[in-house]
């Protein structure tokens, strides 16, 4: 007879966070929006793939807008007032995600582009010949 495993229910504690940091990572294939508190603890996150977009539709601006709105929706109800936005990556959803965050009613204190740029580091991949 197999033993049943003891299930432990872990509930996330709802904390009021008046200030948060929103990280937008826009790659060529997907857009990931992560909301952290000032210490760096993840509060909420969403991606275009988690919103139901598959394949080539994940890198569209509309998918980035939907991911940003879903990541922020719960935090507005918890009382988020002010946020900083860190955007990284060359994807198509950068501007649309920022526009969705700005239209959500949160006061943006800082918008920073933190895309890593090489100082002539690794060799780039060869160009595609289609």
Curated annotation (Swiss-Prot):
Its main location: plastid. Keywords: Chloroplast, Plastid, Ribonucleoprotein, Ribosomal protein, RNA-binding, rRNA-binding. The keyword Cell membrane does not apply. It is found in: Plastid, Chloroplast. One of its GO terms (biological process) is translation. Signal peptide: none annotated. It comes from the Eukaryota. PROSITE patterns: RIBOSOMAL_S11. GO terms for molecular function: rRNA binding; structural constituent of ribosome. Pfam families: Ribosomal_S11. One of its GO terms (cellular component) is chloroplast. InterPro entries: Ribosomal_uS11, Ribosomal_uS11_bac-type, Ribosomal_uS11_CS, Ribosomal_uS11_sf. Part of the 30S ribosomal subunit. HAMAP family: Ribosomal_uS11. Belongs to the universal ribosomal protein uS11 family. This is Small ribosomal subunit protein uS11c.
């Amino acid at each position: 007879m197999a033993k049943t495993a003891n299930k432990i229910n872990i509930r996330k504690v709802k904390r009021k966070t008046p200030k948060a940091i929103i990280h937008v990572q826009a790659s060529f294939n997907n857009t990931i929006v992560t909301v952290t508190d000032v210490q760096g603890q993840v509060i909420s996150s969403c991606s275009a793939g988690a919103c139901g977009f598959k394949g080539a539709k994940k890198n569209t601006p509309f998918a980035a807008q939907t991911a940003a709105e879903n990541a922020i929706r719960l935090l507005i109800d918890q009382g988020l007032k002010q946020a900083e936005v860190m955007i990284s990556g060359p994807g198509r959803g950068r501007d649309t995600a920022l526009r969705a965050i700005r239209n959500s009613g949160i006061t943006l204190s800082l918008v920073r582009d933190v895309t890593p740029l090489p100082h002539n580091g690794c060799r780039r991949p060869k160009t595609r010949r289609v």
